[in-house]
């Protein structure tokens, strides 16, 4: 193989987790998609983030990153889902450092640029429960947020203003989880 091709392949492998669109104002992470079970958006979001980090480190599949298992372990009847504090604890018990914070647009951009997907809580309506999604990308030129929405599909394009409204209604709750070994 010619040296130029080898350099190109090595470069592509080095950035495979963070993909930049042709437009420098947009970026997205190739976060695996997991479809949720009933009331299972939290479990599916945890599974997506854990599977993403497994891919980044070339680790084999881990049963602790399966949404059905996470749902069985963490489901709370009173919450009709999973409590945010239990999501954080699950990550910590499985070798992750976690940070929960009231996020801003700049936080999403900074973490995505570093190859770190985020879990965000959204409140789609006044009577609907919280809904957890994985923020996997941004398209600033088109003012879109790219979500892995476990109730819908991978890379769902949501208008930034709608995302901000639903995120604000949920207190802008944001969870960052990174493997302890990576310290990314």
Could you say what each language-model-derived stretch is?
Residues 71-118:
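Mid-length scaffold segments of soluble, non-membrane domains
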Residues 2-8, 15-80, 124, 141, ...:
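Active-site-adjacent structural segments surrounding the nucleophilic cysteine of cysteine proteases
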Residues 128-133:
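Short, surface-exposed coil-to-beta transition loops
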Residues 8-10, 176:
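Serine/threonine-rich, low-complexity intrinsically disordered segments
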